[in-house]
Amino acid sequence: MLYKNINEFEQVIDKTKRIMCLDFGEKKIGVALSDKTNLIAIPHSVYVRKNTRKDLGGLYGILIENDAGSMVIGLPLDLFGMGNELCDKVMLFANRMIKKYAINIYLHDERYSTAMATRVAKLANIKRKESQKIDDKIAAVLILQQVLDMVKIYQM
């Protein structure tokens, strides 16, 4: 099922499984996973997109291999919180993933995540050429950590 409300998503999370996060892009998708306690976001990989069918299978494979039970996908709203063409593509992708694999997906506002990822890399003295290779998975980590922190608050 697709969730836009963190409180509703928190109620359906399988606490025995990890959570996977995607920073969705036209050419690449950043992937991050929670640790087994669902407290810490860990970078996983940058998935290079092929076509929708292969992308669905490849990303679902990562989910299964890492014993994840649900997914977070960054929703790239504009600066005013409005949807755009990429948001529509994210929604379509999420709905296809749900239809094919029956998993719970939470869409999280990812405004500024790529800019923050670039800044994190810069602060870590990673050269721009190198950071471009990892920005997507850093962005996925930042998105997932926000969600994990929000879930932790709802569980208190």
UniProtKB/Swiss-Prot annotation:
CDD domains: YqgF
GO MF terms, alphabetically ordered: nuclease activity
Segments traversing the membrane: none
Alphabetically ordered keywords of this record: Cytoplasm, Hydrolase, Nuclease, Ribosome biogenesis
Protein location: Cytoplasm
Swiss-Prot/TrEMBL GO biological process terms: rRNA 5'-end processing
GO cellular component, one term: cytosol
Keyword Secreted attached: no
Pfam families: RuvX
EC number(s) on file: 3.1.-.-
HAMAP family, per database record: Nuclease_YqgF
UniProt function note: Could be a nuclease involved in processing of the 5'-end of pre-16S rRNA.
Stored NCBIfam families: RNAse_H_YqgF
Family the UniProt entry places it in: Belongs to the YqgF nuclease family.
Designated name of the protein: Putative pre-16S rRNA nuclease
